[in-house]
A protein has these predicted regions:
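Charged docking surfaces used in two-component/phosphorelay signaling
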Residues: 109-118
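Short, hinge-like loop/turn segments at secondary-structure boundaries
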Residues: 74-79, 123-126, 149-151
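CheY-like receiver
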Residues: 49, 118-122, 126
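Acidic, proline/glycine-rich short linear motifs
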Residues: 2-20, 61-89, 171-177
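Glycine-rich, Arg-bearing micro-motifs that act as flexible, cationic patches
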Residues: 130-156, 170-174
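Local beta-strand N-terminus motif with an aromatic residue
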Residues: 26, 127-129
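Small/aliphatic-rich secondary-structure junction motif
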Residues: 18-76, 99, 103-106, 156
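Short, solvent-exposed amphipathic alpha-helices that sit
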Residues: 45, 83-94, 118
């Protein structure tokens, strides 16, 4: 029996698609936040990335859904009207700041239990070349519990993730006894 007739590794079938090449200066950038306003450092990093190619920027705000009640969706765990309004104002302010710099900007709002999964879905579906997110300084135990958004996004998609470190505003010294 010839080698080609055997069932095994070398079956006929459709070829796998070649991975798409991501341009070095990105032409489409996703600027994302999870339930908080954009910090100036994050906007500066997005502007630095977008400037060489005058990239198109999409500003995405993710509202956090906090879980289920007895396995059923509970309206009290969904983002309320005030949270939506605060998130929309923050996203619009960031978009206006980028438009003042001359960039073409689109705005998106979404809600999700798993924000990193939603950001990765947006990046894949709309073919972005770079993702910029804030990486606030947190203790290690909190990173383990809450997860690291930048690492989770990078694990879910092949688009480069630029995590901008944000220093903590709290004083984390030990309290006097």
């Amino acid at each position: 029996m010839p080698d080609t007739a055997r069932r095994g590794r070398f079956r006929r079938g459709a070829a796998t698609a070649a991975p798409r090449r991501i341009p070095d200066p990105p032409r489409r950038i996703l600027l994302a936040t999870v339930a908080q306003p954009f910090r100036p450092e994050v906007l500066t990093r997005a502007i630095d990335l977008a400037t060489p190619e005058h990239a198109k920027i999409t500003v995405l705000g993710i509202a956090k859904v906090y879980g289920t009640s007895l396995g059923l969706p509970n309206p009290g765990l969904q983002p309320n009207r005030i949270e939506w309004q605060t998130l929309k104002e923050g996203v619009d302010a960031a978009a206006d700041a980028l438009r003042m710099r001359g960039f073409e900007v689109r705005v998106g709002l979404s809600r999700s239990r798993n924000a990193s999964k939603m950001i990765a879905k947006w990046a894949k579906a709309r073919n972005f070349h770079a993702i910029v997110v804030a990486d606030p300084e947190r203790p290690r135990w909190r990173r383990v519990i809450e997860g690291d958004v930048a690492h989770e996004i990078g694990r879910r998609c092949v688009v480069p993730v630029f995590a901008v470190p944000i220093p903590s505003t709290s004083d984390r010294r030990a309290r006097p006894a």
